[in-house]
Every structure is written in C-alpha cells, then in structure tokens.
Amino acid sequence: MSTDTPVPSPQGDYVPAVAHDGVVYTAGMTPRVDGVLLCTGRVGDGIDLELARRAAAVAAANALAAVRSVAPDGAELRCLKMTVFIACGAEFTALSSVADGATGALVGQLGERGRPARSAIGVSSLPSGAPVEVELVCAA
C-alpha cells in the first residue's frame, strides 16, 4: 500500500484528524479512492471476505494519511489503537478476518510500529453504505 495516499475530504462537518500532546486521533475513514467508495453494501451480503479485507486496507491507508497530515514532520508514528467497524448481518462472524486487512495495510507502511491494539465491531450500517470504517489513534 502506498505511503502517498491523499487525505480523504471530510463527508461532513469534521476534520480528518486532530493532534494533541503527541497523539493523533482520526475520524472514521471509509474505503474511498479519489473520493469514491471502493464498494458499498454489507459484508456477507453482496460483499465477500476478500473484497471486505481490501476495503479495510484502503480505509486504514486513508486513516494513516490523515494521521500524517497533522503529525509533526519526521515523526516516527506508532499505531496505538484501531477500531474497525464492519457493516454486516448478525450471522457474519469473521470480523477479525476483515480487520486483518486493515492491520496488514498499516504494517505494510510502518512495519511493526503499525501493528495496533484493535477492536472489530459489526454494525448494521455505515455512512454512505460503506462496508467498513476505520478509526485510528497513533503516537506521533
């Protein structure tokens, strides 16, 4: 995954990331490429596991781009906590497998400093019909 991912434009009245006392918090990032969602729908119901993992990777790359946009120049980033929200039905239980796509994107860019503590949470819907949304907290 490229380290030159542009910061996604906010889809509402918020900023992509906020830095405070050496910690960066991101807004929820969806899998947008050039402002367009990679896919829409619910995982396990039109979105298969492979596509969901790819969408999670794109969302995580977007979150990391948001972190970099407010982190001090030259900061050695360390991903502390990631929350991956997955739009799915009650019967879908491979949440951690979807979130592994997001973790892989972070580790691909930052090495072991990109491997965060993590939660994977199933939800009924996400903004604009996105299948995944990623929030990231990083030390900068």
Regions found by a protein language model. Name each.
Residues 1-83, 88-140:
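N-terminal presequence-like segments and the immediate start of the first folded domain
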